[in-house]
Amino acid sequence: MPNVRLPFTQDEYAERLTRVRTSMAAAGIEVLFTCDPSNMAWLTGYDGWSFYVHQGVLVGPHGDPVFWGRAMDARGALRKCYMAEDDIVSYSDAYVMSSERHAMSHLAKLIADRGWANACLGVEMENYYYSARAHQLLSDDHAGTLRDASLLINWCRAVKSETEIKFMRRAARIVENMHTAIFEYMRPGLRKNELVAEIYRAGLLGGEDEEGTFGGDYPAIVPLLPTGLDATAAHLTWDDQKLEAGAGTFFEIAGCYRRYHAPLCRTIFLGTPPKDMLVAEEALQEGIANSIDAARPGNTAGDVARAFYAVLEKFGIARDGRCGYPIGLSYPPDWGERTFSIRPDDETVLWPNMTFHLMPALWMDEWGLEITEPLLVGTSGPATCLADYPRKLFVKA
């Protein structure tokens, strides 16, 4: 469409579409319906806050993808997507939050009108944006078979292009600025909501690289910054209470540029940290270094995890769960790509230009400690840290 400013070239979108169709053919899927906004954006360029209603992209055997969504959002698709107007299809507001009709009936008719009534249709059954009711109605109305295509496109996104890596490096510049602002403003007596305002300010102001300045985007997850005993829990946000001396606060945040994320977590202690936290800091620093060294092309996600857990075992620290996940393009409620995990039993092979968040946080009985890194798998040797920020427990009097 004229006057559409796409974040990537037409050639890159065409290569992505080919990659998806290759995966569809391998899975025996003739037509694919994705409602994950990350996958929609990756395939078409669409970027809008419309994922609270039913929407999606159809990929058929031939031709461009088809955007399908609410009528008022079709105008946004015309402004953001590369497809022609005939491939931007909408349903009326009569379908929105109605107990009498459902948008999936409209989608089923669209699929039939395109000549795909009897096609094997792939749907993302394990997805935040695809409801049980939607699946039931689509199953009833579509004459062909439905097949689970969860993560099919997500896996196609695993290896990043050079432009995607550039966007993630910019996101990393942004998150560095966010942490600099946190350390500057954090002090006893400051209300947490005021600190969060500074975090958002730094994140949206953006950053600078050799090409000039650039602005930030909203991250898929809000800032997580629990303090003291609250920091023994992983996913608490903030309140309007004042920060007090004698406690640590971890900051789980990400810079975001054109929907590409670079998460980076650090912890600040106001006062003197307890000795066991300092020992844990030493363990994390050594474990992270081990993991980065293990994150080489041809190694596995499990190799990276085992390298980290070997250090924890040496320090006598017990920890359950994974210690990382892939990152890139994302929308709320999560900035992860939801494919592989950095854990000992995951044998996913690492390829050059894969990106993941090494996230070996420790949530102990009396405090929490987060020191993490966004990593890029190279063509050889250890992974590269996308961000350049001191890897330590910060202490502020």
Show the residue positions of the predicted features:
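Active-site neighborhoods and metal-handling regions in enzymes and metal-associated proteins
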Residues: 1-397
